[in-house]
């Protein structure tokens, strides 16, 4: 629908060395506002709310400005705030720059909090083992979905040179991804109230004929009807 930046004027440059970018998009009939960020790096781990040059304070100010923007402008919207936020969401107060967000658990949730609190092998920044890349979602998403899947994507494990090759040629951060499950999967492809071989035959026909019909045939909700939907359907029939 639209792509634009917010907090672009000079008065916000201290908090946002890179202005947040908003993507307004529709997917599977739902509207989402995705706010991409790259917060100020570094610091000494101590949040000094008096010193405006303090790196932790700059990140603290940035996340609270984003919260204010969402609360005022997008109070009923499906909002995802993500990016390299350059700080630890699992840090103890009073030095957790995200504490105001964490305290407002009715309206906000870090989808990757379990990763941040878990084993360091799943963290997004291996060079100085820490989890700095986050996905924050609003209550419209976590209350309105049927499930969430979040994981750090270890592309380096698929490269011959491993982490060294990835770090040198791609990034020093691993991406963090989220899958939002908005609907309970339906295996009744033909809509006759029964799940059986006739549903497999119809789905095979759709796949072979490259039919782009979505509807109930898109079992995994990836906006395509393909072999992966067929695998899910056959697995369901074998197990039920």
Give the ranges of each region predicted by the language model:
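Acidic/histidine-rich helix-loop elements
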Residues: 42-58
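Alpha-helical segments with a strong preference for the paired helices of cellulosomal dockerin domains
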Residues: 71, 93, 189-213, 222-240
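Extracytoplasmic/secreted envelope proteins and their assembly/folding machinery
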Residues: 20, 60-63, 67, 95-98, ...
């Amino acid at each position: 629908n639209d792509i634009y930046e917010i907090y672009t004027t000079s008065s916000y440059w201290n908090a946002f060395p890179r202005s947040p970018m908003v993507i307004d998009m529709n997917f599977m009939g739902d509207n989402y506002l995705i706010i991409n960020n790259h917060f100020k790096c570094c610091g000494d781990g101590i949040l000094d709310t008096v010193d405006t040059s303090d790196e932790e304070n700059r990140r603290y100010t940035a996340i609270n400005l984003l919260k204010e923007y969402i609360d005022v402008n997008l109070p009923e919207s499906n909002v995802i705030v993500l990016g390299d936020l350059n700080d630890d969401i699992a840090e103890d107060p009073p030095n957790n720059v995200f504490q105001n967000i964490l305290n407002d658990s009715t309206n906000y949730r870090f989808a990757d909090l379990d990763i941040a609190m878990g084993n360091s092998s799943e963290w997004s920044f291996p060079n100085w083992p820490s989890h700095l890349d986050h996905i924050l979602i609003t209550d419209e998403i976590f209350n309105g979905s049927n499930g969430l899947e979040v994981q750090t994507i270890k592309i380096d494990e698929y490269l011959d040179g491993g982490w060294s090759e990835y770090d040198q040629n791609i990034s020093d951060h691993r991406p963090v991804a989220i899958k939002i499950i908005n609907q309970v999967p339906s295996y009744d492809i033909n809509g006759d109230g029964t799940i059986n071989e006739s549903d497999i035959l119809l789905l095979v026909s759709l796949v072979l004929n490259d039919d782009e019909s979505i509807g109930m045939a898109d079992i995994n909700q990836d906006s395509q009807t393909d072999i992966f939907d067929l695998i899910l359907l056959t697995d369901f029939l074998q197990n039920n």
